A protein has these predicted regions:
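A generic alpha-to-beta junction signature in SAM-dependent methyltransferases
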Residues: 11, 103, 107-109
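Conserved beta-strand segments of alpha/beta enzyme cores
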Residues: 41, 66-68, 114, 133-136
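Conserved SAM/SAH cofactor-binding pocket of Class I
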Residues: 2-86, 96
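Conserved beta-strand signature within the Rossmann-like core of class I S-adenosyl-L-methionine
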Residues: 107-122
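A short, conserved alpha-helix within the catalytic core of class I
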Residues: 92-101
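Non-DNA-binding regulatory cores of transcription-related proteins
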Residues: 72, 99, 121-124
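Short glycine-rich anion-binding loops that position phosphate/pyrophosphate groups of nucleotides
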Residues: 25, 88-91, 123
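Active-site capping/gating segments
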Residues: 120-158
Length: 158
């Protein structure tokens, strides 16, 4: 769960901000972020029905009215969002291709609208291939657990 909350150490979401969690799996990072930012609106998207069923149950059990789980491939979405969050779904160039057109320009939080992505390892080459300017935040700056040693939040504005 701390891994998911590292995003909140980088960016706080404003009231009414629309956040898309791509490949949400069991609800990370969208569930912890929806708890932390009750005035923001989260869409948790995954193409696997079983995973979305879990997120639906968790959201209902926690009373998260600001979280909407959707069983969908993100490439087919037509809605636009202020921020896109995700956790190691695919290579960054492919990910950016999927979601860039879904991002609204503007600023609905402490950073301009954009992508906040959780990923580990050496990302320099992968990020360069996107053609975007990225800001890399090492998670050990926020949390001292050994698990986070190579983990990062990477951000690029729309």
């Amino acid at each position: 769960m701390l891994h998911s909350l590292a995003i909140a150490k980088v960016c706080t979401f404003g009231d009414g901000a629309r956040i898309l969690d791509v490949g949400c799996g069991g609800g990370f990072p969208s569930v912890p972020l929806a708890i932390l930012f009750p005035e923001a609106r989260f869409t948790a998207a995954d193409s696997i029905r079983k995973k979305i069923t879990v997120v639906e149950g968790v959201a209902a059990g926690l009373g998260l009215t600001n979280l909407t789980p959707r069983c969908v491939r993100v490439e087919t979405l037509t809605e636009r969002f202020d921020y896109v969050v995700s956790r190691a779904v695919t290579a960054m160039p492919e990910f950016v291709g999927w979601i860039w057109s879904r991002l609204e320009k503007g600023q609905k939080g402490s950073l301009p609208n954009g992508i906040l992505y959780l990923k580990g390892g050496d990302l320099a080459e992968e990020l360069a291939l996107t053609g975007k300017r990225w800001h890399v935040y090492d998670i050990p700056r926020f949390f001292g657990e050994e698990f986070f040693e190579t983990k990062k939040v990477v951000y690029t504005p729309r």
